[in-house]
Amino acid sequence: DGEEFDWVSGGTDLLANYKWRINTKPHVISLSKIPGIDTVSNLEIGCMARLSSLEGGNVHPMIAEAAGKVASSLIRKSATLGGNLCLDTRCFWYNQSEDWRRSIEWCHKADCGTGSDCRVIPNQNTLCVATYQGDIAPVLMVLGASVHLIGPSGERVMLLSEFYQLDGMKKNVLEKGEFLLK
């Protein structure tokens, strides 16, 4: 994530959040025109690969089955692997309309700067427990998948299991301006 922008691939989750004014940024940068990042093979899946292309693609059967169970067929035709792996965390308290969020006390994720409490686990005041909601990551982790990240500091590769954080606000290890390539 960048401070002033979000990367968008399929947009099925990000754009819905923007509609609710959740974590909006001044700019959205599409990855759709970058050539070759929609590849699907048995060894490599690009970040722009549509989930629908994984259902019947040349991938491990567990990946195909998991992709086929995500949402509806219409969403799978737009949703991408990169978007699914980089979903924002979800919280019953935070992922509501702007008016609803204003009607309750702030939480860690709302970033009001007051040292607020987590609404899910009150009185612990140290950690946001909003959870990751993606469908494909668990299967890829079981298979020992790695992710390739690229950004201003160059490229890096890590196990997908090392990509996520145990914090609802800092959901993954992406640095400013970096994105998941494959």
Language-model features, listed with the residues they occupy:
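C-terminal structural segment of proteins
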Residues: D1-K182
